[in-house]
Amino acid sequence: ECDRHIRTYWTYYSAVSNSVPIATEYMFSDLAVYGKTDVSPSDPNFQIATGLTPIGGYHTTQNDGEYIGYFWDETYNAIKYANTILTYIDQVSGLDSATKNAYIGRAYFHRAFSYMQLVFEYGDVPLVTQIISSPKQNYRSTKKAAILDMITKDMEFAVQWVPEQANSATIGSVNKGGCRMLLAKCYLATGQYAKAQAQCDILISSEGYSLMTSTFGTFNPGGEPKTWPITDNVIWDLHRPENKLIATNKETIMGMVDEGSTTLSFIPFPTMRIFGPFWNSTGTLKSPDGQNGGETWARNNSNYNVNLDFLRAIGRGIGTWRPTYYAQHTMWKVNGVEDTVDLRHNSQVGNWGSMTNIKYNHNGSSWYGKNFLLRNPSNNALLCTDTIRDWFDWPHYKIFLNDVVAEADPTATQFNGASNGGKADWYLYRLAEAYLLRAEAKFYLGDATAKDDVNAVRTRAHCSQLYTGNVTIGDIMDERARELYLEEWRHMELSRVSYCLALSGKSDEFGNAYNVATYDKQSGTDLAGGSYWYKRVVLDGNIYNKGTLNSNGQNFNYTIDKHNLYYPIPNAAIIGNNKGKLMQNFGYDGYDPSTPEWDNYEDAVKDESSK
C-alpha cells in the first residue's frame, strides 16, 4: 500500500482531469502559477497572500487548483500505513532478522519521506510513530529539527538493511539506492554536509548507477510525427514511461509504477491537458484573418490533415498551470546565453514546445499551414488575448504521454495524457539528482568542484554552455529546475534549501544570509526580508506581487506572502485535537509563539501513549 500510495502525490487517485497534487508544488514556487483565467480573479489560487488560511483556500479534493489539504491528509495516511508495519511486524512469525529489518527499513523510508515533506511544507507538526488503539486528542507539535533528527536515524538503519534493487524481485518498491537518496537529504537538512556528500559519492561511483548519455530503450515517435517530428535523443528516451523502469536504464534509482488497466495498477495522468497551453481556444486565439487559430479535428473529420494534427501531437491543453517566464526562458541562461542547444530546451529535436511551432489549421483561413503569431503583422495587434492561459512554452518531452484510449477512437477530439491501459511510470529518484545533491553539499562545504557535478548533468543534456567558476546555490537550484521538472517537489525543495542556507550561514545568489530563528517568521509582500524561498518566487518567478495583469478580459493580481513559506495547519486538525494545542504557523490566524512544543522526538514518542 505504501509503494502504491506514493505515486498519488503526482497523479490524483480518483483521476480528476484538470489538476493533480504535484502541481501545488509548482504553484508555490518560482516555476508556475495558476492559469485558469475563466475563474474569478479573487480565487485563492491567485490571491494566495490573503486567500490561504487555516479554513480557506485549503482543498483536499477539487477539479481545479491547489491540493494543500490533500498533502496533509494523504501524508498522514502514508505515515499510518508505515506505522502499521512497524507496530505489527513483531507479530509476524517466520521472518529471519534480515527480512524483518528490510521491512522495517522500507517502512522507515515511507515515514521519513512523509515527514520530510511535512516539516518543510507545514513546519512543526504532530509526530505520530505508532498505531493508536483509541483516539488521542492532546497532541503537541514537534519541532522540525527534532523530527529531522528522528528520520535521519531511521534512514541510517534503512540504508543498512534494505536490499539493492538488483536483489529485489519487485520494481517500484523501496530499495537501498532510494534510501541513500533520502538519507542524503536528511543529512543536508541536519547540517551534516560531508555525510550527505558521502552518500552521493556511493550512489555515483559504487552502486552501478550511471547517467544515460545515449539513446536507449524503445523509441516513441510521439503523438503524430508528421506534425511534430521527434529526432531521437537521450533526453526524449529518458522520459518515456516505457523506458523509465527497464533494466538498461542505469540512471533510475527508484521509480513509481503506473501502468495497466486496473485501479490498483494504474491512475490516469492527464499531463498534456493540465500542463499544456490552451492552443485551441476559440475565443481568445485567432489567426491574422480573424479565424480560429487551432482546431482539434478528429481523424474521421473531413477537415483533418495529418500534417497539422496538433491534437495528437501535443494534446489538448487547458493551461491549468502556466510556467513562469523564468521557467520558459530566464533559467535557461548560463553565461548570459539562453541555451537552446540544451536538449531539455531544444525545439529543433522536438523536445521543447513553443507556440510559434504550432501552425494554423482552420480550413478556409488564408493563414492555413503557417506558424502561429502572437501579433498581427499588419497592425501589431495581439492575436492572443489570453496570454496567461493560451500562450506559453512547455517542456514537451516531460508532459507528452500517449493517450491510448483516444488513439483507439477515430472520433476523439481530446488527447489528454496517459489513459486507461497506458503507461505513466514516473521517477522518484534518479542519478542526475544525486549529482545535484552532491553539488549542494559541496556548496555548503566550500568545495569548488560543485560546478563539476552540475556540469556533468549539463554535459549529458548536450548543453553549449557550462559553468566555469564557482557555482552559487542559485545555479544549483536552476539546474534542479531544468533537470527535475515535475519530478522534484519544488516548493518542498526550496523550503528545505531555505532552512539549509540558514543552518549553514552561507549566502544565496542575491547576497542574502539567513537566521535560522527568523527566516520563517516574517510576513508582507514587499521585497525586504523573507526566506530564500520567497526571494526565488518573487524575484525569479516574477509574477507574484507585480501588480495587475489583464488577460481574457479580466484583471489578475497574483499575490503571495512571506509567511506562505509554510502552509497553515488545517483548522480541522486543530479542532480535532481539543485536549491539546497544535502550533499554528506564523502569519496565520491562531499563531501563538507560547504554544508548548516537543523539542526532541524521544519525548514526543513517549507522549503518544497519553490521552
Identify the role of each PLM range.
Residues 3-10, 14, 32-122, 138-146, ...:
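Conserved, well-structured interaction surfaces
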Residues 148, 193, 447-448:
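TPR-repeat structural position
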